[in-house]
Design a protein with these regions (language model features):
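Acidic/polar, glycine-enriched structural segments that form the non-catalytic walls/loops
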Residues: 19-358
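Sec-dependent signal peptide recognition
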Residues: 2-8
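C-terminal motif of bacterial Sec signal peptides marking the signal peptidase cleavage site
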Residues: 14-15
Length: 358
């Protein structure tokens, strides 16, 4: 597949006409390929991120309906540092999952295996295949009434502005128009959102226990007894939550502009309810309690715009607008989107395997 894409790219470039050397209009190149979403589609989620942290949203611009997307492209919130291991009461050792093999190097070598026969070796192998696993740091979405269904979200107009790294979502819910902007800080594990609605909805912060599964949304909602979320500090404009899962801890710092009330709805489930029709909040995830200054939505948005404009104006890009091959437009779209996804999902300090952070 990789060779096919390379061949198509070379063929399309050969079909391009360039009567004179001209600088590529990078802004036009990027913005004409901005993704747009017009339906609640589990395969059309959008993401913001910075390589160290990524946050994926549904058509509301937040993670309002994670259950709808769990079998498609799940709504993840993940970081490079966010790892967890289940307890190891049987005290399995790494060497118990290894077997000696002769690979023709003149001596036997240890190799990790998956024993099929029941016994301690299989149990040890199974434990190490599951642990450690990356954590879903938490769902951040609209808190809606129980009877609201995804189909009630109408007139969806959502776009990802890759030039500035911001998702803009417009929709109506029970005849109320909503306008939500979502952005990620380029250097912190932080998202920020701006909500505008005549009847503002609350914001839910719902924290799952991990599943340890391979192809799921990493959310176990049936294990509240195995983890906790504690409100460790709060004032009129901010709150800090401490998450504890077995031996793993991390912190969630929420701040907001305007009047709002944070309440604990149930175990590992908090709701922030604003009173103003326009409401903004940043939310930061950290492995330790953070002493960093609290930022505003405007500051996060400004930092994101500067970061992404620098990203797109540095390094190589490919403009297919002068190509005569009918496949050129689609190929250009895939190249630009791949550059964006690479930056948010795979360009961190430890590039993740396969699909990226979320």
């Amino acid at each position: 597949m990789k060779h096919t894409i390379y061949a198509l790219t070379m063929f399309a470039l050969a079909a391009c006409t360039s009567p004179q050397e001209e600088a590529i209009d990078r802004h036009a190149l990027v913005t004409r390929n901005n993704p747009e979403v017009t339906a609640m589609d589990s395969l059309s989620s959008l993401s913001v991120g910075n390589g160290e942290f990524a946050y994926t949203v549904d058509a509301t611009g937040l993670q309002t309906f994670p259950e709808v997307y769990k079998n498609g492209v799940p709504l993840g919130t993940q970081s490079q540092w966010g790892w967890h291991s289940f307890g190891n009461p049987e005290n399995y050792k790494p060497e118990e999952a290894l077997v000696e093999y002769d690979f023709g190097h003149g001596h036997k070598e240890l190799y990790a295996t998956q024993p099929k026969e029941p016994g301690r070796a299989k149990e040890a192998s199974d434990w190490y295949r599951v642990n450690p696993h990356r954590l879903h740091l938490g769902i951040i979405g609209l808190e809606l009434e129980n009877e609201v269904r995804p189909s009630d979200v109408q007139n969806i107009q959502q776009s990802l502005d890759m030039w500035n790294g911001i998702i803009t979502s417009r929709f109506t819910l029970k005849e109320t128009p909503y306008h939500i902007q979502t952005v990620c800080h380029p250097e912190r594990d932080m998202i920020a959102a701006r909500l505008s609605a005549r009847q503002p909805a609350g914001i839910k912060f719902h924290f799952p226990y991990p599943t340890g599964g391979h192809c799921d949304d990493a959310c176990n909602w049936e294990a509240n007894d195995k983890h906790s979320t504690t409100l460790v500090s709060e004032d009129a404009q901010s709150a800090v939550l401490k998450r504890t899962l077995d031996a793993t801890t991390y912190y969630v710092t929420i701040s907001w502009e305007g009047a709002a009330k944070l309440r604990e709805k149930s175990a590992n489930y908090f709701v922030l309810t604003p009173t103003d029709s326009v409401f903004t909040f940043p939310c930061q995830f950290t492995p330790q309690a953070s002493a960093s200054p609290i930022l505003t939505f405007a500051e996060v948005q400004q930092a994101s715009s500067g970061h992404w404009q620098n990203y797109w104006t540095q390094g190589a890009v490919a403009d297919f607008s002068q190509c005569t091959d009918v496949r050129a437009k689609e190929l250009e779209r895939r190249v630009v989107l791949s550059q964006y996804l690479l930056a948010i999902q795979c360009a961190g300090s430890t590039p993740p395997q396969e699909t990226g952070l979320t």
